[in-house]
Amino acid sequence: MATNEQIRDQTLVLMSRYQELITARRFDEWIELWADDAVCEFPFADPGRPSRLTGQAEILDYMKAYPETISIEGVQDLQLHPGLDPHVLVVELTIAGTAAQTGRPYNQQYVIIARARDGKLAHYREYWNPLVSAEAFAR
């Protein structure tokens, strides 16, 4: 049986790999990091956009469309904060990018709460500033 330290290290590696693959847009590899029944939540999703995705297929379909929405020039200030529960990790990061439809800057800060199970991402909740999104996408 794995120790809390080993589980925590595994969770850190999982989320580091997550960031690497999503930034590179290697979605077919990226989705393999997720549990089959994973849940992905966006509590501040824009009206008309999904706030909850369930399962690999829904999550992959959603994320494959993001390059048509946001052109990411870089990820900055990436900070990984392990939780007391070794399966939980809080992630902070800033994305520098451009909204594809408007050409406006999309410089967004995120806070993510991720929970792993059996070495896979089981639950993911992503928070961002909806005012930045509204400005970038002219909503």
Pin down the residues of each PLM region.
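Short, low-complexity N-terminal intrinsically disordered segments enriched in polar/charged residues
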Residues: 1-36, 138-139
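A short hydrophobic beta-strand element
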Residues: 85-95
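Short, cysteine-centered beta-strand-loop-beta hairpins and adjacent loop/turn segments enriched
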Residues: 97-107
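Short, surface-exposed coil-to-beta transition loops
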Residues: 74-75, 105-112
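Short beta-strand segments enriched in hydrophobic/aromatic residues
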Residues: 34-35, 93-97, 112, 128
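Short beta-strand edge/turn micro-motifs at domain boundaries
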Residues: 88, 111-135
